[in-house]
Amino acid sequence: GGCVSCHTAKDGETFAGGRPIKTPFGTFYSPNITPDRETGIGGWSDKDFAKAMREGVRPDGAHYFPAFPYTTYTRMSHADALAIKSYLFSLPSAAQVNRDHDVRFPFSWRVVQAGWKLLFFDAGELAPDPAKSEEWNRGAYLVEALAHCGECHTPRNSFGALDRTMWLAGTI
């Protein structure tokens, strides 16, 4: 779990990316999230990092593909997003160039992601349920935001969005 499971290729440097993520739309390759200023996220500001995590937008303004779980990370607090950045920036840098995705047309166009977001992205921090206990709300926050459990354990629709009617129903 956590960042390392997607952002570390087999036999690769930790957090240096390159792990293939096969989808019906093609293969995505995880990026380098080490603090390397040239090939990783070392040049990112707090605003850049929070916008990537919570809005699915790169520092250059391009939209991320939803293979990156920003659709779930949007539910985390701004403070937790910056705590993750602080941790990642404390790790060793790896000068590993990011590999281009191998995604079929028209899904390869990042601009298409803007339309996808209009249909399937509900931005915003998870609000606690006042009818539930503090412990329950903390668990919900861990499952629905930080641990992003639904990203692997919820089936997706034909457009690659989580099928919320099947929340945590499994994908195998």
Predicted regions: what they are:
Residues 1, 115-144:
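Electrostatic cytochrome c docking/interface patches
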Residues 45-59, 72-98:
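C-terminal capping alpha-helices of c-type cytochrome domains
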Residues 2-10, 49, 84, 139-142, ...:
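The canonical Cys-X-X-Cys-His
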Residues 5, 14, 38-41, 59-60, ...:
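Short loop/beta submotifs within extracellular cysteine-rich repeat domains
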Residues 89-126:
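Small beta-barrel nucleic-acid-binding modules, principally OB-folds
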Residues 59-62, 90-99, 130-136, 157-162:
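Inter-heme linker and motif-flanking segments adjacent to c-type heme-binding CXXCH motifs
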Residues 10-46, 64-78, 103-112, 156-172:
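Gly/Gly-Pro-rich "capping" loops immediately C-terminal to redox-active cysteine motifs
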Residues 2, 45, 49, 64, ...:
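Stable alpha-helical elements in mature extracytoplasmic
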